[in-house]
């Protein structure tokens, strides 16, 4: 007798090696992603906007961008998009609250954010505990909040003495820093050069030097959606496209430079000179190692983030990534590439 349980089991044993074919029509994937496109986001964007259509039977994607990544996760819980680029903490929080979600790959590895400080006031982590020093973040419980707390915890800083305020998006944070209303804010590494020209602002924290593992953004899907064998093969195709983009970004500066100018939403990106993009490329590929091959999706590594998430109020005590990480599709995509 074929029950729902046995049907699902059969679906997960369906061979994934072949790419999706939809006959006479091409499938239009509904993708949700971060509104910001910095250098670290370029391969993921190229993957679903160009490479996916080259390797499979896909039309141009139906792309929706959102300023707040937590909103992407909320929509995914409701089952709207096919696949999303979401921040890891909000996916963990939703799963902790009972949502059936799956992390199937990383949008990139590590993180390119730095915490820029007003160096007239802050020159060490301990300075952040001074009563008149204020740290600006986007939203309590978001990935930036967790990122900061993890570094403070690592160095034994009393986080109860650190004044952290929510300021919203990057523009608001930068205005507050320049106006000296706050003394530490997160910025993308490719913004550090411009920020330094505005005054005595210096990177205080470079998270990729602090963490052995950090996951900032992931490819995630709704667990119910993933029960469909066709959707499983879609995930493999997306991840293959991501891996191909990662490989090009890492090994071919000219490719990265061209795609950066095409997809970055920095208003001047199209006119960035090669040497400036080369600095960004070197940082991402050599120091941060944002596009590694193979791209890891290791459960034990993800679970090292849980104590930080607990401190940030993202998940409850005893939470884990055990039910969230689904590595089979990434393994199949990597097998395709050899």
Model-derived regions, located:
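N-terminal secretory signal peptides and thylakoid transit peptides that target proteins
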Residues: 1-14
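Short, glycine-/small- and polar/acidic-enriched structural segments
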Residues: 24-168, 173-176, 183-189, 203-207, ...
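A generic alpha-helix surface/boundary motif
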Residues: 42, 46, 88, 146, ...
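Predominant activation on well-ordered alpha-helical scaffold segments within soluble catalytic domains
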Residues: 92, 149, 193, 239, ...
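Pocket-lining segment of extracytoplasmic ligand-binding domains
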Residues: 172-268
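Secondary-structure end/capping motifs
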Residues: 229-315
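Conserved C-terminal helix/tail region of periplasmic/extracytoplasmic solute-binding proteins
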Residues: 302-338
């Amino acid at each position: 007798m074929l029950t729902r349980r046995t049907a699902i089991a059969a679906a997960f044993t369906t061979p994934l090696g072949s790419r999706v074919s939809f006959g006479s029509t091409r499938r239009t994937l509904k993708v949700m992603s971060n509104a910001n496109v910095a250098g670290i986001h370029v391969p993921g964007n190229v993957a679903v906007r160009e490479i996916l259509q080259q390797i499979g039977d896909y039309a141009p994607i139906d792309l929706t961008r959102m300023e707040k990544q937590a909103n992407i996760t909320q929509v995914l819980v409701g089952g709207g998009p096919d696949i999303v680029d979401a921040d890891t903490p909000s996916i963990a929080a939703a799963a902790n609250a009972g949502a059936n979600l799956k992390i199937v790959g990383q949008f990139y590895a590590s993180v390119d954010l730095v915490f820029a400080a007003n160096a007239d006031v802050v020159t060490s982590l301990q300075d952040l505990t001074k009563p008149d020093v204020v740290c600006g973040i986007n939203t309590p419980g978001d990935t930036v909040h967790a990122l900061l707390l993890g570094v403070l915890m690592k160095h034994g800083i009393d986080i109860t003495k650190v004044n952290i305020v929510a300021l919203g998006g990057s523009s608001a944070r930068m205005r507050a820093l320049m106006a000296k209303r706050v003394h530490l804010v997160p910025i993308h590494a490719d913004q550090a050069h411009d920020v330094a020209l505005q005054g005595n602002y210096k990177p205080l924290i470079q998270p990729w030097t602090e963490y052995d593992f950090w996951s900032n953004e992931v490819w995630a899907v709704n667990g119910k959606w993933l029960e469909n064998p066709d959707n499983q093969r879609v995930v493999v195709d997306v991840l293959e496209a991501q891996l191909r983009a990662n490989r090009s970004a890492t090994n071919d500066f000219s490719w990265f430079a061209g795609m950066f100018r095409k997809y970055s939403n920095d208003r001047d990106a199209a006119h960035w000179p090669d040497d400036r993009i080369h600095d960004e490329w070197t940082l991402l590929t050599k120091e941060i190692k944002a596009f590694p091959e193979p791209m890891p999706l290791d459960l034990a590594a993800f679970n090292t983030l849980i104590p930080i998430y607990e401190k940030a109020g993202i998940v409850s005590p005893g939470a884990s990534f055990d039910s969230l990480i689904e590595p089979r599709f990434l393994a199949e995509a990597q097998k395709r590439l050899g």
